[in-house]
């Protein structure tokens, strides 16, 4: 009998109060991060811009938050019109519509099939998203379906979750912001948010994409998860997926 799959990961249910805090804090953190932690935000968003395919027309950004990434883009009117910002939380999507009315805001779960034809997107961007997804393989399969196969790119930034630098950074940043606003224990929040480690994300990407470019931050000359905060990946879709066990 084959071993049971770990996907999708099952998270403990939230109380109504935890759900309220979760939605509120996610928006608060997205509002706070650009103003207090500019260096890491610059890496998060400049990496996808620098590795975008030349002459791209269509973009899907999954987990777009409040649209922070759009501040780093220099889009033509056509590229802006064909930029689809996908967000799961309606309270976050409302912020995208307000700030960036010329892009297309799509409220949907990126772990489910999205209403676009195969190969529609020249770029798919996922900045600090893949670590959050209980059904990560389904999201990656959908990204593979949607990306244009001859010149499209999947542009990803993930945290070095579990590394000493990242653990310390969370302690002095997100945890501090959380406790100032809500008090109490923070661990229930982050342990159900950052549920996929870098090796898990890379393992699920491998059957569908090859790595064209990789960069660690802030120490690219020490390219190891345990010495860094984030990893940027420019990924090329395989002509055919590898067999998935």
Language-model region placement:
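Residues at the starts of beta-strands that form the adenosine-phosphate
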Residues: 58, 82, 153
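Conserved class I S-adenosyl-L-methionine
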Residues: 56-65
């Amino acid at each position: 009998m084959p071993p049971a799959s770990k996907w999708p990961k099952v998270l403990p249910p939230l109380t109504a109060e935890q759900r309220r805090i979760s939605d509120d804090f996610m928006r608060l953190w997205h509002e706070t991060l650009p103003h207090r932690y500019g260096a890491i935000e610059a890496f998060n968003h400049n990496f996808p811009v620098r590795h975008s395919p030349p002459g791209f027309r269509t973009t899907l950004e999954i987990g777009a938050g409040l649209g922070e990434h759009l501040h780093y883009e220099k889009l033509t009117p056509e590229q802006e019109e064909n930029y689809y910002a996908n967000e799961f939380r309606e309270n976050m999507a409302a912020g995208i519509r307000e700030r960036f009315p010329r892009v297309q805001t799509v409220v949907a779960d990126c772990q489910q099939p999205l209403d676009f034809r195969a190969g529609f997107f020249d770029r798919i961007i996922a900045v600090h998203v893949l670590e959050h997804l209980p059904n990560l393989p389904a999201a990656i399969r959908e990204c593979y379906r949607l990306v244009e196969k001859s010149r499209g790119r999947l542009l990803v930034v993930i945290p070095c979750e579990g590394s000493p630098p990242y653990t310390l950074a969370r302690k002095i940043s997100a945890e501090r912001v959380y406790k100032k606003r809500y008090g109490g224990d923070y661990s229930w929040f982050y342990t159900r948010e950052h549920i996929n480690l870098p090796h898990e994300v890379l393992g699920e990407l491998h059957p569908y994409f090859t790595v064209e470019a990789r960069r660690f931050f802030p120490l690219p000359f020490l390219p190891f998860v345990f010495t860094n905060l984030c990893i940027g990946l420019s990924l090329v879709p395989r002509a055919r997926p590898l067999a998935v066990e």
